[in-house]
Amino acid sequence: MSNAPEQKNPQNDPSPAVSLNDQMKRRFEERTHLAEAGINPYPYKFDVTTTSKAIIDSFSDENPADVSVAGRIMAIRRMGKASFLHIQDSEGRIQIYLKKDDVGEASYNTFKLLDIGDIVGVSGFTFKTKTGEISVHARQFELLAKSLRPIPIAKEKEVDGQKVIYDAFSDRELRYRQRYVDLIVNPEVRGTFIKRTKIVALMRNYFASNGWLEVETPILQPIYGGAAARPFTTHHNALDMQLYLRIANELYLKRLIVGGFDGVFEFAKDFRNEGIDRFHNPEFTQVELYVAYKDYIWMMELVEDLLHKACVEVNGKDSTMFLGNEINLKPPFRRLTIADSIREYTGMEIRGKSEAQLRDIAKDLGLELDPKISSGKIIDEIFGEFVEPKLIQPTFITDYPEEMSPLAKKHRSEPGLVERFELIVGGKEVCNSFSELNDPVIQRERLEEQARLRQRGDDEAMIVDEDFLRALEYGMPPCAGLGIGIDRMVMLLTGQDSIRDVIFFPHMKPE
Protein backbone atom coordinates (compact mmCIF):
# COMPACT_ATOMS: atom_id res chain seq x y z
CA MET A 1 0.00 0.00 0.00
CA SER A 2 1.28 3.42 -0.91
CA ASN A 3 2.32 5.81 1.85
CA ALA A 4 1.60 8.75 -0.39
CA PRO A 5 -0.52 11.53 1.10
CA GLU A 6 -4.20 11.13 0.44
CA GLN A 7 -6.76 13.66 -0.71
CA LYS A 8 -10.25 12.29 -0.06
CA ASN A 9 -12.32 14.81 -2.00
CA PRO A 10 -12.25 14.73 -5.80
CA GLN A 11 -12.29 18.52 -5.77
CA ASN A 12 -8.78 18.31 -4.25
CA ASP A 13 -7.49 16.80 -7.48
CA PRO A 14 -5.03 19.36 -8.96
CA SER A 15 -6.89 19.26 -12.29
CA PRO A 16 -10.31 17.62 -11.95
CA ALA A 17 -11.97 17.05 -15.31
CA VAL A 18 -15.56 17.56 -14.16
CA SER A 19 -17.38 18.13 -10.89
CA LEU A 20 -19.38 15.38 -9.21
CA ASN A 21 -22.66 17.05 -10.24
CA ASP A 22 -21.51 17.25 -13.85
CA GLN A 23 -20.60 13.56 -13.79
CA MET A 24 -24.02 12.61 -12.49
CA LYS A 25 -25.73 14.88 -15.02
CA ARG A 26 -23.84 13.17 -17.84
CA ARG A 27 -24.81 9.72 -16.55
CA PHE A 28 -28.49 10.67 -16.38
CA GLU A 29 -28.23 11.89 -19.98
CA GLU A 30 -26.65 8.58 -21.02
CA ARG A 31 -29.52 6.75 -19.35
CA THR A 32 -31.95 8.84 -21.40
CA HIS A 33 -30.04 8.16 -24.63
CA LEU A 34 -30.11 4.42 -23.94
CA ALA A 35 -33.86 4.48 -23.39
CA GLU A 36 -34.38 6.51 -26.56
CA ALA A 37 -32.39 3.88 -28.46
CA GLY A 38 -34.78 1.20 -27.19
CA ILE A 39 -32.31 -0.22 -24.68
CA ASN A 40 -33.60 -0.96 -21.18
CA PRO A 41 -30.88 0.27 -18.77
CA TYR A 42 -32.25 -2.14 -16.14
CA PRO A 43 -33.23 -5.46 -17.80
CA TYR A 44 -34.79 -8.32 -15.88
CA LYS A 45 -32.19 -11.10 -16.02
CA PHE A 46 -28.95 -12.41 -17.49
CA ASP A 47 -27.88 -16.05 -17.60
CA VAL A 48 -24.57 -16.27 -15.72
CA THR A 49 -22.71 -19.57 -16.06
CA THR A 50 -19.53 -18.90 -14.10
CA THR A 51 -17.51 -16.43 -12.03
CA SER A 52 -14.28 -14.54 -12.54
CA LYS A 53 -12.43 -16.82 -10.12
CA ALA A 54 -13.73 -19.99 -11.76
CA ILE A 55 -12.64 -18.72 -15.19
CA ILE A 56 -9.11 -18.05 -13.96
CA ASP A 57 -8.84 -21.26 -11.91
CA SER A 58 -10.04 -23.53 -14.74
CA PHE A 59 -8.37 -21.77 -17.70
CA SER A 60 -6.73 -23.92 -20.34
CA ASP A 61 -4.82 -22.67 -23.41
CA GLU A 62 -5.71 -25.85 -25.27
CA ASN A 63 -9.43 -25.79 -24.49
CA PRO A 64 -10.96 -22.30 -24.47
CA ALA A 65 -14.25 -22.33 -22.60
CA ASP A 66 -17.54 -20.70 -23.55
CA VAL A 67 -18.63 -18.56 -20.61
CA SER A 68 -21.24 -16.03 -19.55
CA VAL A 69 -20.12 -13.73 -16.77
CA ALA A 70 -21.49 -10.55 -15.22
CA GLY A 71 -20.06 -7.83 -13.04
CA ARG A 72 -19.43 -4.16 -12.40
CA ILE A 73 -17.09 -2.24 -14.72
CA MET A 74 -14.05 -1.13 -12.70
CA ALA A 75 -11.77 -0.01 -15.54
CA ILE A 76 -12.18 0.85 -19.24
CA ARG A 77 -9.58 1.25 -21.98
CA ARG A 78 -11.13 2.27 -25.32
CA MET A 79 -9.11 1.92 -28.54
CA GLY A 80 -11.38 2.81 -31.44
CA LYS A 81 -12.95 -0.41 -32.74
CA ALA A 82 -11.81 -2.48 -29.77
CA SER A 83 -11.76 -1.98 -26.02
CA PHE A 84 -10.65 -3.66 -22.82
CA LEU A 85 -12.53 -3.48 -19.56
CA HIS A 86 -12.23 -5.11 -16.16
CA ILE A 87 -15.40 -6.27 -14.48
CA GLN A 88 -15.74 -7.22 -10.82
CA ASP A 89 -18.12 -9.87 -9.52
CA SER A 90 -18.54 -11.41 -6.07
CA GLU A 91 -15.33 -13.43 -6.38
CA GLY A 92 -12.84 -11.13 -8.08
CA ARG A 93 -12.07 -9.42 -11.40
CA ILE A 94 -11.70 -10.57 -14.98
CA GLN A 95 -10.62 -8.71 -18.13
CA ILE A 96 -13.05 -8.47 -21.04
CA TYR A 97 -11.97 -7.89 -24.65
CA LEU A 98 -14.68 -6.18 -26.69
CA LYS A 99 -14.34 -5.90 -30.47
CA LYS A 100 -16.84 -4.02 -32.64
CA ASP A 101 -16.74 -6.64 -35.43
CA ASP A 102 -17.62 -9.42 -32.95
CA VAL A 103 -20.37 -7.85 -30.85
CA GLY A 104 -21.91 -5.79 -33.63
CA GLU A 105 -22.18 -2.08 -34.18
CA ALA A 106 -25.32 -1.62 -32.09
CA SER A 107 -23.83 -3.29 -29.00
CA TYR A 108 -20.56 -1.46 -29.44
CA ASN A 109 -22.39 1.87 -29.65
CA THR A 110 -24.17 0.95 -26.43
CA PHE A 111 -20.79 0.30 -24.86
CA LYS A 112 -19.74 3.87 -25.73
CA LEU A 113 -22.48 5.11 -23.37
CA LEU A 114 -21.17 3.10 -20.43
CA ASP A 115 -19.05 4.20 -17.48
CA ILE A 116 -17.06 2.78 -14.64
CA GLY A 117 -19.59 1.45 -12.14
CA ASP A 118 -22.10 0.16 -14.69
CA ILE A 119 -23.03 -3.52 -14.41
CA VAL A 120 -22.76 -5.60 -17.59
CA GLY A 121 -23.16 -9.16 -18.81
CA VAL A 122 -20.76 -10.75 -21.30
CA SER A 123 -20.90 -14.02 -23.23
CA GLY A 124 -17.82 -15.24 -25.08
CA PHE A 125 -14.79 -17.51 -24.85
CA THR A 126 -11.69 -17.51 -22.68
CA PHE A 127 -8.23 -16.66 -23.96
CA LYS A 128 -4.92 -15.27 -22.78
CA THR A 129 -3.60 -11.91 -23.98
CA LYS A 130 -0.07 -11.34 -25.26
CA THR A 131 0.82 -10.04 -21.79
CA GLY A 132 -0.41 -13.30 -20.26
CA GLU A 133 -3.67 -12.06 -18.72
CA ILE A 134 -6.57 -14.53 -18.73
CA SER A 135 -9.52 -12.77 -20.34
CA VAL A 136 -12.92 -13.22 -21.97
CA HIS A 137 -13.30 -12.41 -25.68
CA ALA A 138 -16.86 -11.10 -25.92
CA ARG A 139 -19.32 -12.35 -28.54
CA GLN A 140 -22.32 -10.73 -26.87
CA PHE A 141 -22.50 -7.79 -24.54
CA GLU A 142 -25.43 -6.42 -22.50
CA LEU A 143 -25.96 -3.55 -20.06
CA LEU A 144 -27.58 -4.85 -16.85
CA ALA A 145 -27.67 -1.74 -14.66
CA LYS A 146 -26.66 1.86 -15.32
CA SER A 147 -24.78 3.46 -12.43
CA LEU A 148 -25.92 7.07 -11.97
CA ARG A 149 -23.32 7.88 -9.33
CA PRO A 150 -19.58 7.67 -10.08
CA ILE A 151 -17.68 4.98 -8.19
CA PRO A 152 -14.79 6.53 -6.17
CA ILE A 153 -11.93 4.62 -7.77
CA ALA A 154 -8.60 5.66 -6.25
CA LYS A 155 -6.28 7.47 -8.65
CA GLU A 156 -2.71 8.73 -8.45
CA LYS A 157 -1.10 11.88 -9.82
CA GLU A 158 2.34 13.29 -9.38
CA VAL A 159 2.38 16.77 -7.87
CA ASP A 160 5.71 18.50 -7.20
CA GLY A 161 7.49 15.18 -7.51
CA GLN A 162 5.21 13.43 -5.01
CA LYS A 163 2.42 10.93 -5.64
CA VAL A 164 -0.99 12.20 -4.57
CA ILE A 165 -3.94 9.82 -4.15
CA TYR A 166 -7.38 11.27 -4.78
CA ASP A 167 -10.93 9.91 -5.07
CA ALA A 168 -10.00 7.16 -2.57
CA PHE A 169 -12.98 5.98 -0.53
CA SER A 170 -11.13 5.72 2.77
CA ASP A 171 -12.87 8.09 5.17
CA ARG A 172 -14.05 5.73 7.92
CA GLU A 173 -17.32 7.43 8.72
CA LEU A 174 -18.27 7.64 5.05
CA ARG A 175 -17.35 3.99 4.57
CA TYR A 176 -19.66 2.94 7.41
CA ARG A 177 -22.53 5.10 6.17
CA GLN A 178 -22.17 3.89 2.58
CA ARG A 179 -21.08 0.30 3.14
CA TYR A 180 -22.38 -0.63 -0.32
CA VAL A 181 -19.69 1.59 -1.88
CA ASP A 182 -17.09 0.37 0.61
CA LEU A 183 -17.73 -3.22 -0.51
CA ILE A 184 -17.38 -2.27 -4.17
CA VAL A 185 -14.05 -0.46 -3.97
CA ASN A 186 -12.31 -2.14 -1.01
CA PRO A 187 -11.95 -5.90 -1.64
CA GLU A 188 -10.40 -6.49 1.80
CA VAL A 189 -13.63 -5.28 3.41
CA ARG A 190 -15.62 -7.83 1.44
CA GLY A 191 -13.10 -10.45 2.55
CA THR A 192 -13.69 -9.64 6.22
CA PHE A 193 -17.42 -10.23 5.89
CA ILE A 194 -16.89 -13.46 3.97
CA LYS A 195 -14.74 -14.62 6.89
CA ARG A 196 -17.51 -13.62 9.29
CA THR A 197 -19.92 -15.89 7.44
CA LYS A 198 -17.40 -18.74 7.57
CA ILE A 199 -16.93 -18.28 11.32
CA VAL A 200 -20.66 -18.37 12.01
CA ALA A 201 -21.12 -21.40 9.73
CA LEU A 202 -18.31 -23.25 11.50
CA MET A 203 -19.81 -22.52 14.92
CA ARG A 204 -23.30 -23.55 13.82
CA ASN A 205 -21.98 -26.83 12.39
CA TYR A 206 -19.85 -27.42 15.49
CA PHE A 207 -22.85 -27.13 17.81
CA ALA A 208 -25.22 -29.07 15.56
CA SER A 209 -22.72 -31.91 15.09
CA ASN A 210 -22.87 -32.49 18.84
CA GLY A 211 -26.61 -33.03 18.60
CA TRP A 212 -27.60 -29.68 20.10
CA LEU A 213 -30.73 -28.00 18.78
CA GLU A 214 -30.75 -24.55 17.19
CA VAL A 215 -33.77 -22.62 18.47
CA GLU A 216 -35.41 -19.20 18.37
CA THR A 217 -36.59 -17.25 21.42
CA PRO A 218 -38.50 -13.95 21.77
CA ILE A 219 -36.87 -10.65 20.88
CA LEU A 220 -39.74 -8.68 22.41
CA GLN A 221 -39.92 -9.58 26.09
CA PRO A 222 -42.23 -8.46 28.93
CA ILE A 223 -39.33 -8.75 31.40
CA TYR A 224 -35.72 -8.34 30.34
CA GLY A 225 -32.97 -10.40 31.94
CA GLY A 226 -29.94 -12.63 31.50
CA ALA A 227 -27.41 -9.80 31.68
CA ALA A 228 -26.62 -6.57 33.49
CA ALA A 229 -27.56 -3.90 30.96
CA ARG A 230 -30.08 -1.16 30.17
CA PRO A 231 -32.77 -2.17 27.66
CA PHE A 232 -34.55 -0.49 24.79
CA THR A 233 -38.28 -0.16 25.45
CA THR A 234 -41.24 -0.26 23.10
CA HIS A 235 -45.02 -0.39 23.37
CA HIS A 236 -47.43 -3.07 22.17
CA ASN A 237 -50.52 -1.16 21.05
CA ALA A 238 -52.98 -4.07 20.89
CA LEU A 239 -52.09 -5.34 24.36
CA ASP A 240 -51.37 -1.86 25.73
CA MET A 241 -48.21 -3.03 27.46
CA GLN A 242 -44.56 -2.07 27.62
CA LEU A 243 -42.10 -4.51 26.10
CA TYR A 244 -38.31 -4.65 25.97
CA LEU A 245 -35.90 -5.61 23.23
CA ARG A 246 -33.94 -8.50 24.68
CA ILE A 247 -30.56 -7.85 26.24
CA ALA A 248 -29.83 -11.60 26.32
CA ASN A 249 -31.67 -14.84 25.56
CA GLU A 250 -30.38 -16.80 28.57
CA LEU A 251 -33.58 -17.15 30.59
CA TYR A 252 -35.64 -18.46 27.67
CA LEU A 253 -32.95 -20.96 26.66
CA LYS A 254 -32.85 -22.28 30.23
CA ARG A 255 -36.61 -22.77 30.07
CA LEU A 256 -35.96 -25.09 27.11
CA ILE A 257 -33.46 -27.10 29.15
CA VAL A 258 -36.20 -27.45 31.78
CA GLY A 259 -38.47 -28.63 28.96
CA GLY A 260 -36.22 -31.60 28.25
CA PHE A 261 -33.71 -30.59 25.58
CA ASP A 262 -30.17 -31.69 26.44
CA GLY A 263 -28.54 -28.90 24.43
CA VAL A 264 -29.85 -25.73 22.79
CA PHE A 265 -28.19 -22.79 21.08
CA GLU A 266 -29.29 -19.57 19.40
CA PHE A 267 -27.54 -17.01 17.21
CA ALA A 268 -29.32 -13.91 18.40
CA LYS A 269 -29.56 -10.20 17.80
CA ASP A 270 -29.45 -8.56 21.22
CA PHE A 271 -29.92 -4.90 22.11
CA ARG A 272 -28.43 -2.83 24.91
CA ASN A 273 -29.26 0.84 25.35
CA GLU A 274 -25.71 1.89 26.14
CA GLY A 275 -22.75 3.70 24.64
CA ILE A 276 -21.16 3.25 21.24
CA ASP A 277 -17.40 2.81 20.92
CA ARG A 278 -14.81 0.64 19.16
CA PHE A 279 -16.02 -2.46 20.99
CA HIS A 280 -19.73 -1.79 21.56
CA ASN A 281 -22.71 -1.41 19.24
CA PRO A 282 -26.26 -1.11 20.63
CA GLU A 283 -27.42 -3.91 18.31
CA PHE A 284 -25.04 -6.86 18.33
CA THR A 285 -24.89 -10.58 17.60
CA GLN A 286 -24.10 -13.27 20.09
CA VAL A 287 -24.54 -17.01 20.31
CA GLU A 288 -25.66 -18.62 23.53
CA LEU A 289 -25.31 -22.34 24.21
CA TYR A 290 -26.72 -24.40 27.09
CA VAL A 291 -25.81 -28.05 27.60
CA ALA A 292 -27.35 -30.24 30.29
CA TYR A 293 -25.23 -32.33 32.67
CA LYS A 294 -22.06 -30.27 32.05
CA ASP A 295 -20.20 -27.60 34.06
CA TYR A 296 -18.02 -24.56 33.42
CA ILE A 297 -14.79 -26.59 33.43
CA TRP A 298 -16.08 -28.71 30.56
CA MET A 299 -17.17 -25.52 28.80
CA MET A 300 -13.63 -24.07 28.99
CA GLU A 301 -12.34 -27.02 26.98
CA LEU A 302 -15.10 -26.58 24.41
CA VAL A 303 -14.26 -22.87 24.00
CA GLU A 304 -10.56 -23.65 23.53
CA ASP A 305 -11.35 -26.19 20.82
CA LEU A 306 -13.95 -24.01 19.08
CA LEU A 307 -11.80 -20.86 18.91
CA HIS A 308 -8.79 -22.79 17.70
CA LYS A 309 -10.79 -24.48 14.93
CA ALA A 310 -12.28 -21.13 13.86
CA CYS A 311 -8.85 -19.49 13.75
CA VAL A 312 -7.42 -22.25 11.58
CA GLU A 313 -10.49 -22.09 9.31
CA VAL A 314 -10.13 -18.37 8.49
CA ASN A 315 -6.37 -17.84 8.91
CA GLY A 316 -4.89 -21.23 8.09
CA LYS A 317 -2.82 -21.21 11.28
CA ASP A 318 -3.01 -21.21 15.10
CA SER A 319 -2.60 -17.46 15.52
CA THR A 320 -4.13 -14.13 14.54
CA MET A 321 -3.07 -10.47 14.73
CA PHE A 322 -5.34 -8.40 16.99
CA LEU A 323 -4.80 -4.82 18.17
CA GLY A 324 -1.13 -4.99 17.26
CA ASN A 325 -0.43 -8.30 19.02
CA GLU A 326 0.01 -11.80 17.66
CA ILE A 327 -2.50 -13.95 19.54
CA ASN A 328 -1.80 -17.68 19.83
CA LEU A 329 -5.09 -19.59 20.02
CA LYS A 330 -3.63 -23.06 20.33
CA PRO A 331 -4.96 -24.75 23.51
CA PRO A 332 -4.61 -24.84 26.43
CA PHE A 333 -5.35 -21.26 27.50
CA ARG A 334 -4.13 -19.80 30.78
CA ARG A 335 -6.55 -20.00 33.74
CA LEU A 336 -6.54 -17.44 36.55
CA THR A 337 -9.10 -16.58 39.24
CA ILE A 338 -10.29 -12.97 39.30
CA ALA A 339 -8.83 -12.51 42.79
CA ASP A 340 -5.45 -13.89 41.73
CA SER A 341 -5.45 -11.72 38.61
CA ILE A 342 -6.06 -8.55 40.65
CA ARG A 343 -3.31 -9.50 43.09
CA GLU A 344 -0.91 -10.28 40.22
CA TYR A 345 -1.45 -6.99 38.39
CA THR A 346 -2.11 -4.59 41.30
CA GLY A 347 -0.58 -6.24 44.35
CA MET A 348 -3.96 -5.91 46.13
CA GLU A 349 -5.77 -8.76 47.88
CA ILE A 350 -9.57 -8.65 47.49
CA ARG A 351 -10.46 -11.98 49.09
CA GLY A 352 -12.58 -11.60 52.20
CA LYS A 353 -12.77 -7.81 51.96
CA SER A 354 -15.83 -5.81 52.96
CA GLU A 355 -17.40 -3.19 50.71
CA ALA A 356 -15.69 -0.43 52.70
CA GLN A 357 -12.31 -2.17 52.40
CA LEU A 358 -12.79 -2.64 48.66
CA ARG A 359 -13.55 1.08 48.33
CA ASP A 360 -10.30 1.84 50.15
CA ILE A 361 -8.40 -0.46 47.78
CA ALA A 362 -9.96 1.27 44.77
CA LYS A 363 -9.09 4.67 46.24
CA ASP A 364 -5.48 3.58 46.82
CA LEU A 365 -5.36 2.55 43.15
CA GLY A 366 -6.63 5.97 42.10
CA LEU A 367 -10.14 4.94 41.07
CA GLU A 368 -13.05 7.31 41.58
CA LEU A 369 -16.21 5.30 42.22
CA ASP A 370 -19.91 6.03 42.22
CA PRO A 371 -20.93 5.84 45.90
CA LYS A 372 -24.02 3.82 44.96
CA ILE A 373 -22.19 0.80 43.51
CA SER A 374 -21.79 -2.40 45.49
CA SER A 375 -18.87 -4.74 46.22
CA GLY A 376 -19.23 -6.70 43.00
CA LYS A 377 -19.20 -3.56 40.87
CA ILE A 378 -16.12 -2.28 42.73
CA ILE A 379 -14.26 -5.51 41.92
CA ASP A 380 -15.44 -5.27 38.33
CA GLU A 381 -14.14 -1.68 38.09
CA ILE A 382 -10.74 -2.66 39.51
CA PHE A 383 -10.46 -5.63 37.15
CA GLY A 384 -11.58 -3.63 34.12
CA GLU A 385 -9.17 -0.77 34.77
CA PHE A 386 -6.00 -2.54 35.92
CA VAL A 387 -6.15 -6.17 34.79
CA GLU A 388 -8.24 -6.76 31.68
CA PRO A 389 -6.22 -4.48 29.34
CA LYS A 390 -3.05 -6.40 30.25
CA LEU A 391 -4.40 -9.86 29.39
CA ILE A 392 -3.21 -10.14 25.80
CA GLN A 393 -2.90 -13.89 25.28
CA PRO A 394 -6.07 -15.98 25.82
CA THR A 395 -6.82 -16.16 29.55
CA PHE A 396 -9.78 -17.66 31.36
CA ILE A 397 -10.66 -15.46 34.35
CA THR A 398 -12.60 -17.65 36.77
CA ASP A 399 -14.45 -17.81 40.08
CA TYR A 400 -16.20 -14.47 40.43
CA PRO A 401 -17.89 -13.08 43.55
CA GLU A 402 -21.49 -14.22 43.87
CA GLU A 403 -22.89 -10.70 43.61
CA MET A 404 -21.33 -10.23 40.16
CA SER A 405 -23.06 -13.31 38.76
CA PRO A 406 -26.61 -13.81 40.09
CA LEU A 407 -27.42 -16.54 37.55
CA ALA A 408 -24.34 -18.69 38.21
CA LYS A 409 -24.07 -21.70 40.52
CA LYS A 410 -22.20 -21.22 43.78
CA HIS A 411 -18.62 -22.52 43.77
CA ARG A 412 -18.35 -26.11 44.93
CA SER A 413 -15.35 -25.38 47.19
CA GLU A 414 -14.96 -21.58 47.57
CA PRO A 415 -17.65 -19.89 49.72
CA GLY A 416 -18.90 -16.56 48.37
CA LEU A 417 -17.81 -17.33 44.80
CA VAL A 418 -19.58 -18.75 41.76
CA GLU A 419 -18.47 -21.04 38.96
CA ARG A 420 -18.03 -18.58 36.15
CA PHE A 421 -15.38 -17.71 33.60
CA GLU A 422 -14.77 -14.98 31.08
CA LEU A 423 -12.29 -15.44 28.25
CA ILE A 424 -10.11 -12.35 27.80
CA VAL A 425 -8.08 -12.00 24.60
CA GLY A 426 -6.18 -8.92 23.49
CA GLY A 427 -7.40 -7.12 26.60
CA LYS A 428 -11.08 -7.67 25.71
CA GLU A 429 -13.80 -10.07 26.83
CA VAL A 430 -14.75 -12.55 24.10
CA CYS A 431 -17.09 -14.90 25.96
CA ASN A 432 -18.78 -15.57 29.30
CA SER A 433 -19.81 -18.88 30.86
CA PHE A 434 -21.34 -20.35 34.04
CA SER A 435 -22.13 -23.55 35.72
CA GLU A 436 -25.78 -22.51 35.68
CA LEU A 437 -27.68 -21.97 38.91
CA ASN A 438 -30.57 -24.46 39.02
CA ASP A 439 -31.71 -24.22 42.66
CA PRO A 440 -34.93 -22.17 42.47
CA VAL A 441 -34.78 -21.13 46.13
CA ILE A 442 -31.27 -19.69 45.83
CA GLN A 443 -32.12 -18.16 42.45
CA ARG A 444 -35.06 -16.32 44.00
CA GLU A 445 -32.82 -15.00 46.79
CA ARG A 446 -30.28 -13.79 44.22
CA LEU A 447 -32.88 -12.00 42.10
CA GLU A 448 -34.47 -10.41 45.14
CA GLU A 449 -31.03 -9.11 46.10
CA GLN A 450 -30.77 -7.70 42.58
CA ALA A 451 -34.08 -5.93 43.18
CA ARG A 452 -32.61 -4.33 46.31
CA LEU A 453 -29.61 -3.15 44.28
CA ARG A 454 -32.01 -1.53 41.80
CA GLN A 455 -33.58 0.35 44.69
CA ARG A 456 -30.09 1.61 45.59
CA GLY A 457 -29.80 3.08 42.11
CA ASP A 458 -28.21 0.27 40.06
CA ASP A 459 -30.29 0.45 36.88
CA GLU A 460 -28.40 -2.52 35.40
CA ALA A 461 -29.45 -4.90 38.19
CA MET A 462 -31.76 -7.72 37.11
CA ILE A 463 -35.52 -7.90 37.60
CA VAL A 464 -37.31 -10.76 39.39
CA ASP A 465 -38.78 -12.96 36.63
CA GLU A 466 -41.52 -15.05 38.25
CA ASP A 467 -42.12 -17.22 35.18
CA PHE A 468 -38.44 -18.12 34.98
CA LEU A 469 -38.46 -19.03 38.68
CA ARG A 470 -41.58 -21.14 38.13
CA ALA A 471 -39.77 -23.02 35.36
CA LEU A 472 -36.82 -23.73 37.68
CA GLU A 473 -39.23 -25.04 40.30
CA TYR A 474 -40.14 -27.86 37.89
CA GLY A 475 -36.47 -28.87 37.96
CA MET A 476 -33.55 -28.01 35.66
CA PRO A 477 -30.68 -30.51 35.37
CA PRO A 478 -27.06 -29.48 35.98
CA CYS A 479 -26.17 -27.26 33.05
CA ALA A 480 -23.30 -25.30 31.54
CA GLY A 481 -24.05 -22.09 29.66
CA LEU A 482 -21.95 -20.02 27.26
CA GLY A 483 -22.33 -16.66 25.54
CA ILE A 484 -19.93 -15.60 22.77
CA GLY A 485 -20.01 -12.14 21.21
CA ILE A 486 -19.87 -12.88 17.49
CA ASP A 487 -18.78 -9.35 16.60
CA ARG A 488 -15.86 -9.45 19.06
CA MET A 489 -14.88 -12.92 17.89
CA VAL A 490 -14.84 -11.81 14.25
CA MET A 491 -12.75 -8.78 15.21
CA LEU A 492 -10.26 -11.10 16.90
CA LEU A 493 -10.02 -13.62 14.06
CA THR A 494 -9.87 -11.04 11.24
CA GLY A 495 -7.59 -8.53 12.97
CA GLN A 496 -10.04 -5.61 12.97
CA ASP A 497 -9.68 -2.82 15.55
CA SER A 498 -13.30 -1.60 15.53
CA ILE A 499 -16.61 -3.41 15.85
CA ARG A 500 -17.88 -1.21 13.02
CA ASP A 501 -15.50 -3.01 10.66
CA VAL A 502 -17.25 -6.36 11.23
CA ILE A 503 -20.88 -5.14 11.15
CA PHE A 504 -22.28 -4.35 7.72
CA PHE A 505 -24.35 -1.39 8.88
CA PRO A 506 -23.23 -0.13 12.31
CA HIS A 507 -25.25 2.46 14.19
CA MET A 508 -24.24 6.03 13.37
CA LYS A 509 -25.29 9.48 14.43
CA PRO A 510 -27.71 11.13 11.97
CA GLU A 511 -25.97 12.79 9.03
UniProtKB/Swiss-Prot annotation:
Gene3D superfamilies per the UniProt record, alphabetical: Bira Bifunctional Protein, Domain 2, Nucleic acid-binding proteins
Location of this chain's protein in the cell: Cytoplasm
Entry EC number(s): 6.1.1.6
One Gene Ontology MF term: lysine-tRNA ligase activity
GO cellular component assignments: cytosol
Cofactor(s) needed: Mg(2+)
Membrane-spanning ranges: none
GO aspect biological process, one term: lysyl-tRNA aminoacylation
Free-text comment on the cofactor: Binds 3 Mg(2+) ions per subunit.
Catalyzed chemical reaction(s): tRNA(Lys) + L-lysine + ATP = L-lysyl-tRNA(Lys) + AMP + diphosphate
CDD domains: LysRS_core (cd00775), LysRS_N (cd04322)
Binding-site residues, Mg(2+) 2: 429
Origin: domain of life: Bacteria
Chief location of this protein within or outside the cell: cytoplasm
InterPro entries, A to Z: Aa-tRNA-synt_II (IPR004364), aa-tRNA-synth_II (IPR006195), aa-tRNA-synth_II/BPL/LPL (IPR045864), Lys-tRNA-ligase_II (IPR002313), Lys-tRNA-ligase_II_N (IPR044136), Lys-tRNA-synth_II_C (IPR018149), NA-bd_OB-fold (IPR012340), NA-bd_OB_tRNA (IPR004365)
Statement: the UniProt record of this protein carries the keyword Nucleotide-binding: yes
Keywords: Aminoacyl-tRNA synthetase, ATP-binding, Cytoplasm, Ligase, Magnesium, Metal-binding, Nucleotide-binding, Protein biosynthesis
Chain sites annotated for binding Mg(2+) 1: 422, 429
UniProt xrefs under NCBIfam families: lysS_bact, PRK00484.1
Subunit (UniProt): Homodimer.
PANTHER family, per database record: LYSINE--TRNA LIGASE, CHLOROPLASTIC_MITOCHONDRIAL, LYSYL-TRNA SYNTHETASE
Protein family according to the UniProt entry: Belongs to the class-II aminoacyl-tRNA synthetase family.
Record protein name field: Lysine--tRNA ligase
Gene assigned in the entry: lysS
